[in-house]
């Protein structure tokens, strides 16, 4: 945060994940005051334990920040899964088995004694980047979060795109193969996530190894250590199969990016999540394929970059959503 004093009011952001919970306090300018070490979500123990953990994470973040609970002007929660954002309901979250039809906003609010602003986790991360991250100089952006799946958030003219049914930015489920496509984590086929997520990359590699026994990936797979990171490292070392797999992944993501250029026409497309550790070469590959699939003007004019806030994007964005609700109304966000 530098030498400047934190600027009140303060906001608490909580980022719920399938394995862990991140939480932090930010000031009115989006500067991080404090973030806790992530704590386990403990999904198998059920939603009541999970809700207790969410509340504990939030209170811990405030306590460790040196602030009092009374100093917190708003609380934001970002969550994965299918949801009804306006109703504050988790519907059928794949990564939170057993948390179906959970009124998570109300239940967390009861535990904290304060109202909670609820948002899709990818939307929250995108808003964090728009507010104080890599997108702070634009009015519209799309952010793909590449990890176990592919999350996506859209900010259009400063507003989070939720859609009528809270499915307004499920861009990981763009269809790129109509018939005979790979099965996605959602159970449907042909979705971008089934081809370009970290999980999909590992699956594609495991299948390809059978036809390339001489690849270094075959040995890594035999040791049970095949991962997206290992595939990227093998590509960097010059392994032909790994190079092809990473290049194919870049091409799939370029298709996704071009689709958003033709529908949202944003100023900026960001890629975040664990897979961006692949670095500049991977990003350049995505950029190089975009002109094949996008009209010339958006292909040329739309910036394509890596996200800037790293793992903090989720809770910073969730806190930013709480700030919106505190300052004006959620339908008219600003910086």
Please name every model-derived segment.
Residues 21-25, 150-155:
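Short beta-strand scaffold segments in enzyme catalytic cores
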Residues 168-176:
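Short, intrinsically disordered, charge-biased short linear motifs at domain edges
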Residues 88-98:
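A charged helix-plus-loop insertion that forms the helical arch/lid used to bind
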Residues 14-19, 145-149, 167:
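A short acidic Gly-Thr/Ser loop motif
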Residues 125-131, 151-154, 173-174:
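Adenylate-forming
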Residues 116-120, 154:
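General beta-strand structural signal in soluble alpha/beta enzymes
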Residues 1-74, 84-89, 106-114, 128-138, ...:
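ATP-binding/phosphotransfer module of carbohydrate and carboxylate kinases, centering on a glycine-rich
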């Amino acid at each position: 945060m530098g030498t400047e004093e934190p600027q009140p009011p303060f906001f608490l952001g909580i980022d719920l994940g399938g394995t862990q919970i991140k939480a932090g306090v930010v000031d009115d300018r989006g500067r991080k005051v404090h973030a806790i070490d992530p704590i386990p979500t403990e999904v198998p123990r059920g939603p009541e334990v999970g809700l207790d953990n969410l509340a504990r994470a939030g209170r811990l973040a405030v306590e460790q920040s040196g602030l009092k609970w009374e100093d917190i002007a708003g609380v934001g929660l970002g969550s994965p899964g299918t949801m009804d954002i306006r109703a504050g309901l988790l519907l059928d979250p794949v990564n939170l088995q057993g948390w179906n039809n959970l009124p998570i906003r109300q239940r967390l609010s009861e535990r904290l004694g304060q109202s909670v602003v609820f948002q899709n986790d990818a939307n929250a991360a995108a808003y964090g980047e728009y507010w104080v991250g890599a997108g702070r100089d634009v009015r519209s952006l799309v952010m793909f979060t590449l990890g176990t799946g592919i999350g996506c958030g859209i900010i259009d003219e400063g507003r989070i795109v939720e859609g009528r049914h809270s499915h307004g930015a499920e861009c990981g489920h763009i269809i790129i193969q109509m018939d005979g496509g790979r099965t996605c984590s959602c159970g449907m086929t042909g979705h971008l996530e089934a081809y370009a997520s970290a999980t999909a990359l590992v699956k594609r590699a495991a299948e390809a190894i059978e036809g390339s026994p001489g690849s270094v990936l075959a040995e890594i797979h035999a040791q049970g250590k095949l991962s997206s990171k290992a595939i990227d490292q093998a590509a960097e070392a010059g392994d032909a199969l790994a190079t092809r797999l990473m290049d194919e992944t870049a091409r799939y993501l370029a298709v996704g990016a071009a689709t958003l250029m033709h529908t949202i026409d944003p100023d900026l497309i960001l890629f975040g999540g664990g897979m961006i550790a692949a670095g500049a070469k991977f990003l350049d590959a995505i950029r190089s394929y975009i002109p094949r699939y996008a009209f010339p003007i958006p292909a040329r004019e739309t910036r394509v970059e890596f996200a800037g806030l790293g793992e903090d994007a989720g809770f910073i964005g969730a806190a930013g959503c709480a700030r919106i609700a505190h300052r004006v109304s959620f339908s008219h966000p600003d910086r």
